[in-house]
Amino acid sequence: MRHKFSGILIAIVLLFVAAPVWAHHSPSAVFDMSKEFTLSGTLTKVDWINPHIVVFMDAKKDDGSVENWKFESNPPSWFRRVSLGRDDFAKAIGQTVTVQGVRAKAGGLYGYLLKITFPDGNSLELVFKPTP
């Protein structure tokens, strides 16, 4: 009986520990996955950091004003596995890229990167594209 209780207790503890980890790794916790959009602009910066790279771009609005967008993405290790490195992004800084993404639930100029098309026409679509 004692071993059975210990096993149940361990299972309950693991469930409580795993839930926040799963939520952290789910873009749908922060981003509205049902609201995809496409945006073109100048790639200004890429933070090649763990746990997720962050892509910054300036996009001109119809009135000529510039919006400074920030897109979160997969970790650097994911990009290396698909043969795309920091240098590939560095070459595109200052050039026009097209991003397909979803907006943050909190609003603002913040999104999750689903696809990026580089100036040479090559594009990369993230494999992990959850549904709402």
Where are these regions (language model features)?
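Conserved hydrophobic positions within beta-strands
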Residues: 39-43
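Cleavable N-terminal signal peptides
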Residues: 10-11, 21
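Short boundary/loop segments of OB/S1/cold-shock single-stranded nucleic-acid-binding domains
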Residues: 22-37
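OB-fold/S1-family single-stranded nucleic acid-binding modules
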Residues: 102-128
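Short aromatic-glycine-enriched beta-strand elements
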Residues: 49-60
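Bacterial N-terminal signal peptides that target proteins for export
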Residues: 1-9
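Short nucleic-acid-contacting surface segments enriched for D/E, G, S/T with interspersed K/R
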Residues: 81-99
